[in-house]
Amino acid sequence: MAARDSDSEEDLVSYGTGLEPLEEGERPKKPIPLQDQTVRDEKGRYKRFHGAFSGGFSAGYFNTVGSKEGWTPSTFVSSRQNRADKSVLGPEDFMDEEDLSEFGIAPKAIVTTDDFASKTKDRIREKARQLAAATAPIPGATLLDDLITPAKLSVGFELLRKMGWKEGQGVGPRVKRRPRRQKPDPGVKIYGCALPPGSSEGSEGEDDDYLPDNVTFAPKDVTPVDFTPKDNVHGLAYKGLDPHQALFGTSGEHFNLFSGGSERAGDLGEIGLNKGRKLGISGQAFGVGALEEEDDDIYATETLSKYDTVLKDEEPGDGLYGWTAPRQYKNQKESEKDLRYVGKILDGFSLASKPLSSKKIYPPPELPRDYRPVHYFRPMVAATSENSHLLQVLSESAGKATPDPGTHSKHQLNASKRAELLGETPIQGSATSVLEFLSQKDKERIKEMKQATDLKAAQLKARSLAQNAQSSRAQLSPAAAAGHCSWNMALGGGTATLKASNFKPFAKDPEKQKRYDEFLVHMKQGQKDALERCLDPSMTEWERGRERDEFARAALLYASSHSTLSSRFTHAKEEDDSDQVEVPRDQENDVGDKQSAVKMKMFGKLTRDTFEWHPDKLLCKRFNVPDPYPDSTLVGLPRVKRDKYSVFNFLTLPETASLPTTQASSEKVSQHRGPDKSRKPSRWDTSKHEKKEDSISEFLSLARSKAEPPKQQSSPLVNKEEEHAPELSANQTVNKDVDAQAEGEGSRPSMDLFRAIFASSSDEKSSSSEDEQGDSEDDQAGSGEANFQSSQDTDLGETSSVAHALVPAPQEPPPSFPIQKMQIDEREEFGPRLPPVFCPNARQTLEVPQKEKHKKNKDKHKAKKEHRRKKEKKKKHRKHKHKGKQKNKKPEKSSSSESSDSSDSQSDEETADVSPQELLRRLKSLPLRRQ
């Protein structure tokens, strides 16, 4: 027994590391808690942790990486000799031993690689790959992938294998018995000899009987349905050129060169592989790297039995036997289907064996001759006194009015309608207003008090309106005052009468709005039963009471809102200048010339606009540019008032133009343009000779000046000219000297006007501008002559206008206005132009000062030429040339300059000291000169 026990002890198998035996009396050690445990390395030394929470790496003396100095740069070692021994470092070369351990970030484990895996071919994987290749945009593209990268199983296959799935089995619950062979369909007839009763089916059934019940089998491996989403722009079931069918053919077509050597070729276009070769592109002409071994001879498998040796009739069909031809069906039914449907059938679909029953199409119904596609239902209008006009219109359009069927039916009438037909008086309902409970005397007393208060309010309003009319009569023109009074009367009448012309609370219901208007009319007349009269007798008592409350509430609301608005707003004290609007000054001119230039396609200067724009001073500072108008107070475009375009401006246009209105308009323009004389000339100031206006623009400007209403607050000069206007027209045969004396005493302007015209300020300005343009005069000779001519016209126009203000009108009849206007046009460069002259001797008075002005201009040109010669001679003097000529010409220049200066100073002194009478005498004595 002892031996047996010892043998049994020796046969025991021990697992794990045994504990050290404890000595007698020694207690077992307690486990060390987690916080007291330490980490040691292989040699038993304590390990220090260097991380983010314990100081990180250290490069000092202690605990350094390699040396006392810490990191040291490695010396350069040439790798030319041992270049072949150089190995590429990977991440594992930089890891610690802890990272490569079992609990590290890259533990080492023994794993079976693909090289040592099973060599059996995975059919499921191949079918999936071929399905992917067939549905790809380029079929057969996976052939190149097989050549480049090896195919690997996905995660799904790995999971299935770990769950117990094996290659070649299906996915799903296990079955107990093998599936029996499918029995033939009883509806299908089988021709030929019947099989003997004892066949393989019986033996298979007998084999199944011997199998135990607890044995299960894996389901059959079935290729899953391809649920690939359509993510391309091709049509349904579109496939490009399949290289399997094009190069190698399929089993059901004309012939297949590789059918003998490939037994595994399926519908997916699987290519049979000879000699265990890899999939690849076969070809004799080009080499493709690793596939440059000798290819199979495809012509060695050909036999002459596949070709016809006897001439015979052509086979039915179109003769297209290539791989692109549609498939030919064997039996007649399929050929009929082929004729009916040409194309490829989608995967999962098949042609129907029975045709669809054709739908019977019925002909459309026959329309009558008088049929109209749109039917118009004529309105049914009852014959009452209120809509007699509507009934008449309907009878004229349709021939007769449609009677209301409700009036003849007894079922359509209610009690109120029957009472109305019988002529009975409607029964009054209960009182819904507090006023109806009052007695008759109290109602009359309230009415008298209301009339008294209304009368006092009307008297006070009339007094205030009369006072306002008297105070505003001096400020308003007669037409505007008449319109203002009529507007006040209309406003007072609207306030006194409670008429809601614009206030329609029941606009959606015309009948109700009509009753509400009748209620307001009765209320204005002061009738007591206004509400009861306007209500519809066909309504019920509840509806009548509700409508009575709505009418009273609406009238109260309108009265309160009307009184609130009238108390908050008042009439205007001053008249709005409705006949004029402010527009930019440069836009005031007529744009007819520009439009005509655009029509003629003459683009350029004629279609461009130049505006005078005054920038803000802060803007000039920000952009660091000088202010072009330092003395200007305007910002933006200068604006002037212009008449509104209206038909009424031309209704009161007289045949001949009169002098006072023109003078008043010019004085008005001078008041607007007075403080802006120092500005630069703009397009507004250009003369009409340069603009070349047509007769239409002249007519418009004349109509504006004539249609402008005269203001009462005009200057005294205009009033005096208006008083003397009839004298100029009526007393044309009076003596010339008497008229001159009366006109000079009555309408003599101030001396400022004479100084502005005859002083040398304009000459100085023109001379300074000519000096500035002196260097470029040779290049701009044409423009200088034009400016000189325009300045001559300006001076002549100003002189003639003042002379006409002093000289009386002669006895000869005045010429027409447009001709005179074209002769007296001037350039408005230094302010507004003066009124035109209406006298026959205007041309003479215009030509009188032309000679003197022409002489002054000649003197200016001479002085300018001499100044230019002086500069040239100074240059020659610096070069020390022509000294003798310079000495001879110096006294001549000094004498000529002194004479010109003295003449200018004398002329200035004479013009400053000459009296107005002497000036008139000199103007009369000047000789006339024709140009």
From Swiss-Prot:
There is a cross-link at residue 312 (Glycyl lysine isopeptide (Lys-Gly) (interchain with G-Cter in SUMO2)). GO terms for molecular function: RNA binding. Pfam families: DUF1604, G-patch. InterPro entries: DUF1604, G_patch_dom. The keyword GTP-binding does not apply. Residues 1-41, 73-92, 169-209, 568-595, 659-931 are annotated as: Disordered. The modification N-acetylalanine is found at residue 2. The modification Phosphoserine is found at residues 6, 8, 357, 477, 715. GO terms for biological process: mRNA splicing, via spliceosome. One of its GO terms (cellular component) is nucleoplasm. Residues 582-593, 669-695 have a biased composition (Basic and acidic residues). Residues 659-668, 786-802 have a biased composition (Polar residues). Residues 896-905 have a biased composition (Low complexity). This is G patch domain-containing protein 1.
